[in-house]
Regions:
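Active-site-proximal segment of tyrosine recombinases
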Residues: 149-150, 229-231
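Active-site/catalytic core of tyrosine-dependent DNA strand-transfer enzymes
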Residues: 178-229
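DNA breakage-rejoining catalytic core of tyrosine-based enzymes
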Residues: 104-120, 170-181, 193-196
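Conserved tyrosine-mediated DNA breakage-rejoining catalytic core shared by Y-recombinases
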Residues: 143, 152-187
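Basic, Lys/Arg- and aromatic-enriched nucleic-acid-binding interface segment
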Residues: 115-147, 171
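Short, leucine-enriched amphipathic alpha-helices that occur as contiguous helical runs
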Residues: 36, 118, 132-134, 210, ...
Length: 231
């Protein structure tokens, strides 16, 4: 299957020294090599094959367990691993790379909302039935989206598993969503009878503005006893 490269245990053992040699040949520093191998080992401790969905879940795992700077280091490492595999296997690999956490997302996760506060924020929103804002928090944390990009997500994009975002320079940036998050969000939409259109709308059904998202996040953080400056 294109986009999936099965990796059994023996193959992993073969690939680690080969990956190490690839990094040395590229004149990576000892610290960079060490960091890349940590990312490699962590990924394969969680998943037995390489698939886009597993890579996205890996990013979600990193976000839930590490600070933003560490998340980006691990993403860099796994992307170098994908470079290495693409060089070896060519057409058997699709050209997919994880996006790093952007400045705004890093601020949301690490400036300085603790992992404990992040988990508390999600849980309090979900337990109180405030699902719209629960999903705002989830999509911000699980993707590389800016708030201005977040508000463009529609139900149709959840069925696709991604959204194509057009930059000022005319380039397209594809933002992927983890399957589990798509499924959970689609169940939420189905429960309220929505089959299409923007995910994040106000009571009148209008798209919430980026400023509205940022402002309300701070208000909700205060209610959840979370420092508003961290969101």
């Amino acid at each position: 299957m294109k986009g999936v490269l099965s990796m059994n245990t023996n193959m992993q053992e073969i690939n680690e020294p080969a990956f190490h040699a690839y990094l040395k040949k590229a004149q990576a520093s000892p610290n960079t090599i060490r960091s890349c191998l940590v990312a490699y080992r962590l990924y394969h401790s969680l998943y037995n094959d390489l698939a886009v969905n597993h890579l996205l879940c890996f990013k979600d795992y990193l976000i839930r367990h590490y600070k933003a700077s560490t998340v980006n280091n691990r993403i860099y490492g796994i992307n170098r691993y994908l470079d290495f595999l693409e060089e070896i296997y060519g057409s058997q690999m699709i050209h997919f790379r994880l996006t790093v956490i952007r400045t705004q997302q890093a601020a949301f996760l690490d400036n300085i909302i603790s992992q404990e506060d992040y988990e508390t924020f999600k849980k309090r929103l979900k337990d109180s039935g405030n699902m719209l804002w629960y999903f705002v928090v989830r999509f911000l944390a699980c993707t590389g989206a800016r708030v201005s990009e977040l508000i463009q997500i529609k139900a149709e994009h959840l069925h696709l598993g991604y959204i194509d975002l057009y930059t000022k320079g005319g380039k397209v940036r594809r933002l992927h969503f983890p399957d589990a998050l798509c499924q959970e969000a689609l169940e939420w939409l189905s429960a309220k009878g929505q089959v299409s259109g923007f995910l994040f709308v106000n009571r009148r059904g209008n798209q919430i503005t980026a400023r509205g998202i940022s402002s309300q996040l701070k208000t909700l953080a205060i209610r959840c006893n979370i420092p508003p400056e961290t969101v």
